[in-house]
Amino acid sequence: AMGGEPKLCLNIMAVPESMPKEAVHDILRGGYDKVYEAGALITGGHSIYDDEPKYGLAVTGFVHPDKVLTNSGAKPGDALFLTKPLGIGILTTAEKADLLSENGKAFAVRLMTTLNKAARDVMVQYRVHACTDVTGFSFLGHASEMATGSDVQLEINTAAIDLIPEAL
């Protein structure tokens, strides 16, 4: 979320001891496939046993020092773009409680496995002043952090925000 190009990645994984090795392999293979799609390499990682499965990547990349984007560079008059619909956290929480439909699961997986590479490739062609990735801190949390860090006010057209229907 800084405008850089990913180059090297480390796997970070926690799995229950009872998880089948095939499932662990599939998770790691999926990570490898996405890293390859992004044009980067996995150079190692770390794994532990835990009751709840978790997988992520620590990513190192490169960006020209004059083109580093942070969440505190927004300027008055900037437009705010969302590259994915909001609500994925609600879907994943619903899945943990076995409340998510099969369509909802498929949609969540598709969103979570879609790289932000296309958005990044478009973004670096323009004079972007700030960016962030909406995570568990929520859209409003990230918007507040961006506004405060940039010393600007945000005007949000809530009708224009793409929301995941099943998250409502």
Each language-model region and where it sits:
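Helix-biased detector of long, well-ordered alpha-helical tracts
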Residues: A1-L168
